[in-house]
Design a protein with these regions (language model features):
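ATPase nucleotide-binding head domains, primarily ABC-like/P-loop NTPase cores
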Residues: 68, 369, 376-593
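Alpha-helical coupling/stalk and coiled-coil linker elements that connect catalytic or binding modules
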Residues: 1-424, 431-437, 443-460, 483-484
């Protein structure tokens, strides 16, 4: 069971976190004990002129430095472990439904002119996006939103993503590690801004700045050495120190402006460096992943470039210390060297940085799509039927938004024509349509679908499920539905494959007009290049097949046990012969016995 796997991973991670907490306490106690011993040994040894005590103090100083470094490394690991536990918790949330509390629901990507976004719950609360999203960068989230489309995309890219997701499914622990490293990034981190800053060339003459820095720094260092070790005049090094510091102050505003990006990107650079190192050593050997990860290795290696830039960012950060600024610039013209090196880095690596960040954004998309396979016992990669009449064949299909324990699997054997589904209220008609549409969206994205097998023709999905009026626009619910069906008819004239899903057709008008309008709409939407699924409570629509229209019937039904109404949510062939509206009215206390 997949849930058992993630619970075991969590238990192991919790034990690891407990061990880290224990070692953290030990490091704190050790540092607290060693520091005063170091001070006492050094001060006492200096006062008494004792070489032995000074050596002991030096030993304690070295020991304290080692403890500090080990403590910092442990803190980084603790932070990663906490992020890892958070990611494991997100996976476990997919099994109990608590994932719907996630604030990242993709509501910002909802488009009013794209009904499937709401009808199929692609974006928004309790949506496909909310279930899937493992992205923490803005680019990754944007790419995931673009992938979740009701319109078929480039099948070459879809199949490449399928292959990459297949490989991720074989390495669930790697997926957890990568997601945990991504979770350490700032939420919705805009990598495009970072890429732009890294690629921005330095204005002015790099060679001049570099030459000035090298000449003056060397002159000051050599004059100091001459004065200290050979008894030379101090006038020259003092004059050079003053001149260098004056130069640094004169160019301060420019160096501050040029080096400013390093200040706020230092933390992100370290995180991306660790992410790219994890990707470099990951056992991802498929051709699909090789193509995705190739920018990390050529023309320049991402980990080497980011490592050098991280060192430069640390050097630039030292300038914030006033005393270091005075000494480093007076002797070495530190600012000039930092600015020259940053410009040199931009020329060598800046253009490639944008491609590195795109690699991670695409990896975030793949990690998101893989969540279906990581959390569903029954899943399959869809097969696309690109030739012949449209078809949608599914075995044991369920809706991703329902937990696997509560979802009832159903089959689909749909070809060109219309399927009219009847059944009682709450029997599962709308959920079945959403199941078909949502799995089609997952298929187009390159994700596994919630089914034992799934074959479909790439076809645009048009929906009319959640209809609402528009008071500001003066549009009633009925007219809003008419506009949607009109769009379906307009698109159908292109002759391209379509999957049309209409729930309770023309529910917003009286029964006589509804039946007349529905019959005509179904006639016009029953096409050789379209699969149309319509739910209704009007049994009259079940007779359209007798008029020579390729219409088939299916239904959901209920049964009663005492005063309880029960559903099995299984679709059956043929029309429905029962209703439950009066029973529900009595159950709600609206109608008397």
């Amino acid at each position: 069971m997949k849930k058992d796997f993630y619970e075991n991973v969590r238990e192991h991670a919790l034990a690891h976190a407990h061990t880290q907490d224990t070692w953290r306490t030990r490091f704190i106690l050790a540092r607290t004990a060693v520091f005063p011993l170091m001070l006492v040994a050094l001060v006492h040894g200096y006062d008494r002129g004792s070489v032995e005590e000074l050596m002991l103090g030096g030993f304690f100083l070295l020991l304290f430095a080692v403890l500090v470094l080990r403590h910092r490394r442990l803190e980084r690991r603790r932070i990663f472990t906490q992020a890892y536990l958070g990611v494991v918790g997100e996976y476990l949330a997919r099994f109990d439904g608590s994932w719907k509390k996630s604030p990242v629901d993709g509501a910002a990507y909802l488009r009013e002119k794209c009904p499937p976004d709401r009808d199929l719950h692609i974006f928004g609360a309790a949506s496909l996006y909310q279930y899937l999203c493992a992205a923490h960068t803005r680019m990754g989230r944007d790419r995931l939103a673009a992938a979740l489309s009701a319109t078929p995309q480039d099948l070459t890219r879809t199949r490449r993503r399928q292959a990459a997701v297949t490989e991720l499914l074989a390495h669930p622990l790697l997926a957890l590690e990568l997601e945990a490293r991504g979770a350490l990034l700032p939420d919705a981190h805009d990598t495009r801004v970072l890429a732009k800053e890294l690629a921005q060339p330095l204005k002015g003459s790099l060679k001049l700045i570099s030459c000035i820095g090298i000449v003056l720094a060397n002159a000051c260092v050599w004059s100091l050495c001459w004065a200290i070790f050979f008894g030379g005049s101090w006038a020259i090094p003092i004059a050079l120190f003053t001149f260098n510091l004056t130069m640094a102050m004169a160019f301060f505003s420019r160096t501050q402006r040029e080096l400013a990006p390093l200040g706020h990107m230092a933390s992100a650079l370290r995180l991306y460096g660790r992410i790219f190192r994890a990707l470099e050593r990951a056992p991802l050997r498929s051709a699909a992943f090789h193509a995705i990860l190739s920018p990390l290795f050529a023309p320049v290696r991402a980990t080497i470039g980011l490592s050098r830039l991280t060192i430069l960012a640390d050097c630039a950060a030292m300038r914030r210390n006033f005393f270091f600024f005075i000494l480093a610039n007076g002797i070495l013209l530190w600012d000039f060297h930092c600015m020259a090196y940053f410009s040199h880095w931009r020329k060598g690596y800046g253009a490639a940085a944008a491609d590195w960040l795109k690699v991670w954004a695409e990896t975030e998309v793949l990690l998101s799509l893989a969540r279906v396979g990581h959390t569903r016992e029954v899943h399959a990669f869809p097969r696309f039927a690109e030739e012949g009449a449209p078809q949608l064949m599914a075995e044991d299909a369920t809706l991703l938004l329902l937990t696997e324990e509560t979802a009832t699997p159903n089959d689909a054997q749909l070809t060109a024509g219309t399927l009219v589904i009847t059944g009682s209220n709450m029997s599962g008609k709308t959920t079945y349509m959403r199941c078909l549409g949502a799995n089609a969206v997952l298929a187009y994205a390159g994700a596994p679908v919630c089914a034992r097998s799934f074959t479909l023709t790439p076809m645009a999905v048009y929906t009319s499920i959640q209809i609402s009026d528009d008071l500001a626009g003066g549009i009633s619910t009925f007219y809003a539905e008419l506009l949607r069906i009109k769009k379906m008819m307009v698109y159908s004239k292109r002759g391209k494959p379509m999957l049309i899903l209409i729930d309770e057709i023309f529910r917003g008008t009286n029964s006589a007009d509804r039946i007349v309008g529905a019959r005509e709409a179904i006639r016009r939407l029953t096409l050789p290049h379209a699969i149309t699924v319509v739910t209704t409570h009007d049994f009259e629509l079940c007779d359209l097949g007798r008029e020579g229209i390729p219409v088939t019937n299916a239904h959901f039904e209920e049964h009663y046990e005492g005063d309880k109404i029960l559903f099995d949510f299984k679709m059956r062939a043929g029309r429905c012969h029962t209703t439950n509206a009066q029973y529900l009215l009595r159950m709600a206390g609206i109608m008397g016995e």
